[in-house]
From Swiss-Prot:
Entry protein name: Alpha-1,2-mannosyltransferase MNN24
Pathway: Protein modification; protein glycosylation
Superkingdom, natural source: Eukaryota
Listed transmembrane segments: 10-30
Organism for this UniProt entry: Candida albicans (strain SC5314 / ATCC MYA-2876) (Yeast)
Gene symbol of the encoding locus: MNN24
Length: 709
């Protein structure tokens, strides 16, 4: 590690000279590179490095942006294989940079760049916490300069305005109720035999051979789409192209049913609110509604233990943005968690039912909770995280860079292909041209993506359709100002989801629920959004029978890096040589999910993708259930046979370049529930009980196992 002794002018001069030589080499290579950066701020990256050179020459250790704010430069991402380099501005709260930060960037520059003739150098913005602190100070001054009575009165007016908002919203939704019976039943999936026959004819399989065929690869529960069908990364060869004809075979609606749903949908679009009610801004003087950025969780009851773990790691990663935990019901409100623990982590609870009319509280169903949480949360721009979602890196930087700054809604993919029924597009009035292919969701080399006959076009590769893949909304970035109507239309979808829209969006596929409502609403309203392209990656032990990875957790990737790699060929039109970040293609593909001769688990869509979130959803970190009862399904850190194992195999550690994130999770679990001061939460064994002691011993044992495995 380099440092510059203040007392030694000679040594300082030598080191500065060496750094200048390195910078000159970097700039020369940068100019030789045929690629200029796509980040708006990095158009001036040469000037920024010149600024750094001048700063160091004049014994200055900081840089200033156009507004005079102090920042340093730190490494954000460096992939040695593709030689993609991303440097981040780090805004400083003090006038001098942290010594570790300075040395970090020094070492970043002193890497092997000078030996590279070409590399792709990019600059991104960091999060300027000074603006956040300024806002907090202004808010505190505002509260100190007004009486309690005035603040209390205005907050009550704000809450009443929110309740009125929901009254109007629910009245509008109920006024547009579809005039037909529910469609989410077996009667609307009558084509099981027809689908099997279709598969037999398409693949020219003799009827005798079909007797050995696993029907569950085509249908489940009479005639629904396979739960785990259409694995996007594995591209199983036996799977049929999901063209319009094939997708239309599952959920079956009559003309009158389609007409009734279309009438309801059209009426809601014509009567839905266009903007937030003015009263919410009239009475938000003393609160943070629609002000700034923040991170939102949906917690309450047993979920609080999951939220606490996630927030603890969030803060450990360096995030400073405020956190809100939305608690659905009063019975779920944990005083210990909300009033004592969360404030120490710059977080607070918000009780959902305070903002809802009582008549609506009794009607809330589980799949509507996320939508409501997004609406009532304080912030204008939100990173929403499920309680069981754990950030691997500091997510604050996502707020200050594309794609979020340009698209205002970022969604991540599920493991599976999209299974949305063509009927949805008819009902929503979205024109899809099945004869016009605008993208190819099959990787190069897959014959299913090469057809020129439109009858073989994947429906969700066609003009007007929502692109692949299906959505996984354990994490979601949304600007509530720009996407207000997205949330309102999604609320309509979720209100009538279980009876109508969930089967239209998923047709029985894995995770059927609210997950498709946000992207569908934005798509219908023609509002901007970005889908992360890198495959969702399952982590877990390898199944002894299928040799495939179990789904213990899902890994999601950095949207900043993803956006760059996915858009580079369209944004760099003037370069002589375009850098292609697509990964080399697999040599072969498995026939189906039971084929143990081949797996493309290590295949990434892009060469330089960076893992960002771990959605630890099965098993969740309910510590008693996980460590003492193996999650009831032999999914714990110790198998039913007594063998210790990593929950996410060695693949998670490999994906993170050797960083043992599972070990870090376990150490934080121990900190949360086994170290002083011991915390009692709903769903956690009582402090001092034998069960609590046994859980902590099991966590400690797993930590020791991970440290040597």
């Amino acid at each position: 590690m380099f440092s510059i002794p203040v007392s030694s002018k000679t040594v300082r001069l030598i080191l500065v000279s060496l750094l200048l030589i390195t910078l000159i080499n970097i700039l020369a290579a940068f100019q030789r590179s045929t690629l200029s950066s796509w980040f708006p701020s990095s158009r001036h990256i040469i000037n920024k490095f010149t600024d750094l050179r001048l700063a160091l020459s004049s014994q200055e250790s900081v840089l200033r942006d156009e507004e005079g704010e102090i920042y340093s430069l730190v490494g954000y991402h460096h992939d040695f294989d593709s030689n993609l380099v991303v440097v981040q501005k780090q805004y400083l709260l003090e006038k001098t940079p942290n010594e570790d930060t300075t040395e970090h960037f020094w070492n970043f520059l002193q890497s092997n760049f000078e030996t590279k003739s070409e590399y792709d150098l990019n600059l991104i913005d960091g999060y300027n916490y000074k603006k956040l602190i300024k806002h907090l100070n202004e808010q505190n001054e505002l509260q100190l300069s007004h009486s309690f009575v005035e603040q209390y009165k205005m907050e009550n007016q704000f809450i009443q305005s929110f309740q009125n908002f929901f009254v109007q919203l629910i009245d509008t939704i109920e006024d547009c109720k579809p005039d037909l019976d529910p469609i989410n039943n077996d009667n609307h999936y009558p084509n099981g035999d027809k689908i099997v026959k279709y598969y037999e004819l398409r693949n020219k399989i003799p009827s005798e051979n079909m007797k050995q065929f696993n029907i569950e690869r085509l249908i489940h529960r009479n005639g629904r789409i396979p739960i785990y069908g259409g694995h996007l990364r594995e591209q199983y060869k036996d799977e049929l192209i999901r063209n319009k004809e094939f997708l239309s075979m599952y959920l079956t609606l009559s003309d009158s049913e389609i007409s009734a749903l279309k009438k309801s949908h059209t009426k809601f679009l014509e009567t839905m609110m266009e903007n937030w009610p003015e009263n919410l801004f009239k009475f938000n003087k003393f609160n943070n509604f629609m002000k700034g950025d923040g991170i939102v969780y949906l917690g309450g009851g047993k979920y609080n233990q999951l939220v606490l773990l996630s927030i603890k790691i969030l803060r450990e990663n360096g995030s400073r943005l405020p956190v809100e935990v939305i608690i659905p019901y009063k019975n779920d409100y944990d005083i210990q968690f909300c009033d004592r623990v969360l404030p120490t982590l710059n977080g607070k609870c918000k009780l959902m039912t305070d903002y809802l009319p009582q008549t609506f509280v009794d009607k809330i169903s589980g799949f509507q909770l996320k939508n409501i949480a997004l609406l009532i949360s304080s912030f204008e721009r939100i990173l929403y995280l499920d309680a069981d979602n754990i950030p691997i890196r500091n997510p604050d930087v996502l707020f200050t860079n594309a794609p979020f700054t340009t698209k205002h809604l970022v969604v991540w993919p599920d493991l599976w292909r999209r299974s949305t029924s063509p009927h949805y597009y008819t009902i929503a009035g979205i024109e899809v041209d099945p004869n016009f292919k605008v993208r190819n969701s099959y990787v190069d080399g897959d014959e299913r993506g090469k057809y020129t006959d439109s009858m073989y076009y994947s429906y969700h590769d066609c003009k007007g359709s929502i692109p692949e893949a299906s959505s996984e909304t354990g994490q979601l970035l949304i600007n509530k100002k720009i996407h207000f109507q997205t949330l309102i239309l999604a609320m309509y979808y979720n209100y009538y989801g279980p009876d109508y829209y969930y089967p239209l969006f998923s047709q029985g596929a894995a995770g059927e629920g609210d997950k498709e409502t946000f992207i569908a609403a934005a798509h219908k309203l023609d509002l901007p959004y970005y889908q992360v392209g890198e495959f969702n990656r399952e982590f877990g032990p390898i199944n002894d029978n299928t040799r495939k990875h179990e789904f213990y957790g899902m890994g999601q990737y950095d949207p900043i890096i993803d956006y760059y790699m996915s858009t580079i060929t369209t944004t760099q039109k003037d370069t002589k040589k375009k850098i292609n970040y697509n990964s080399p293609l697999p040599e072969k593909y498995a026939a189906n999910d039971e084929d143990d001769t081949c797996s493309n688990y290590d295949f990434h869509l892009f060469q330089s993708s960076s893992l960002f979130f771990l959605h630890a959803n099965w098993p969740k970190y309910y510590i008693e259930k996980l460590f003492l009862y193996s999650y009831d399904e032999d999914r714990g850190p110790v198998t039913n046979d007594g063998d210790k194992r990593r929950l996410y195999g060695n693949e998670l550690k490999k994906e993170l370049g050797g960083y043992d994130f599972e070990l870090n999770i376990m150490k934080n679990l121990h900190w949360c529930f086994c170290e002083e001061p011991l915390i009692d939460l709903i769903g956690i064994p009582v402090v001092g009980s034998k069960t609590r002691t046994d859980v902590c011993i099991a966590i400690k044992n797993h930590i020791e196992f991970l440290e040597i495995s």
